[in-house]
C-alpha cells in the first residue's frame, strides 16, 4: 500500500435503495397505467383486478396520470443509476501536497466536478453529527477561507464509530486537527 497517496471511493447513485425504489415505482406505475387503460376499454380482468368496477372518468384518468408520473420518476432514477450521479473519489497526495475531490454530475455542462486544493489551504477536518429522525453524520474538509467540502457519501448514514475512525485516519494522514468531536 502506498503511504504517500490515499484514495477514498465515494458511492453515488448505484445504491441498493435506488434500485429498489426504481423497481417499486416502475412496477406500480405500470400497474396504475394498466388499470386506467383497462377501465377505458372496459376490460373484465387483468391481474385479478375487475376493471368494470372502475369508472374511466375520474378514477381511470387519475390512475393513468399517477402511473405515468411513477414511470417517469422511475426512468429518471434509472438514468441517475446508469450515470452514477454523485459517485467519485477523494484523493490525498502527500508527494504533490494536493487534494483532489472528483464527483460525477447529471448534465453535459456539469458532467464532472473536480476540485483541487493544496495542503496549505486546508485548516482542519470537521465532523458534523445530528441524531434526529433523519440522522446526519458527515465529514467535512474545512479550508482556511471557511469553506466546508463534504467528503462522505450521501445516503444511508454511516455508523458513528466509522465516521470517527475515518475522520481520525484522515486527520492523521494529512497532519491537521479535527473539529466537532
Curated annotation (Swiss-Prot):
Keywords: Chloroplast, Membrane, Photosynthesis, Plastid, Thylakoid, Transmembrane, Transmembrane helix. Its main location: plastid. It comes from the Eukaryota. The keyword Cell membrane does not apply. The chain crosses the membrane at residues 19-41, 61-83. Disulfide bonds: none annotated. It is found in: Plastid, Chloroplast thylakoid membrane. One of its GO terms (biological process) is photosynthesis. It is a multi-pass membrane protein. GO terms for cellular component: chloroplast thylakoid membrane; photosystem I. Belongs to the Ycf4 family. Seems to be required for the assembly of the photosystem I complex. This is Photosystem I assembly protein Ycf4. It comes from Guillardia theta. The lineage of its organism: Eukaryota, Cryptophyceae, Pyrenomonadales, Geminigeraceae, Guillardia.
